[in-house]
């Protein structure tokens, strides 16, 4: 897909685990090591310019069970990174996994709570250049996205 001309300027957003997301933030090599499923594109985040960005969907081998303060904060950092990449002007599209049954982020390895998947998906489709990150803790439930 990456080699196809229509994806030459695409940012690939993959489902990350929190541990490797944090490792990337700290500049550790495991932050760019390939993973399973759509995290196979994780190494692309180490390129210049980055071709991928991660959205944490779980930790310690399990999907996030609830949208607690820690999960909200980690997702906020991920969305800030994605927003900064989109604002760079290098990308004309984002590619990410979608579960059309739920209108939610697709997931296969981790099984995060469906509400989290829906909120992440809704925030991803709202990422636009020059706009504030769509994920914030300024609204009820800790997200800038309306709850279903």
PLM features: what roles do these ranges have?
Residues 1-148:
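Macrodomain-like recognition of ADP-ribose-binding/processing modules
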């Amino acid at each position: 897909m990456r080699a196809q001309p229509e994806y030459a300027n695409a940012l690939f957003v993959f489902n990350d685990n929190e541990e490797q997301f944090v490792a990337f933030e700290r500049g550790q090599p495991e932050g760019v090591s390939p993973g399973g499923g759509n995290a196979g594109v994780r190494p692309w985040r180490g390129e210049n310019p980055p071709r991928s960005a991660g959205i944490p969907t779980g930790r310690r081998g399990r999907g996030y069970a609830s949208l607690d303060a820690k999960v909200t904060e980690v997702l906020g950092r991920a969305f800030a990174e994605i927003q900064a990449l989109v604002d760079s002007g290098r990308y004309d599209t984002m590619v990410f996994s979608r579960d059309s049954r739920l209108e939610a982020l697709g997931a296969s390895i981790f099984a995060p709570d469906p509400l989290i998947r829906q909120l992440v998906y809704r925030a991803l489709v709202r990422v636009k250049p020059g706009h504030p990150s769509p994920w914030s803790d300024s609204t009820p439930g800790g997200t800038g996205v309306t709850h279903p």
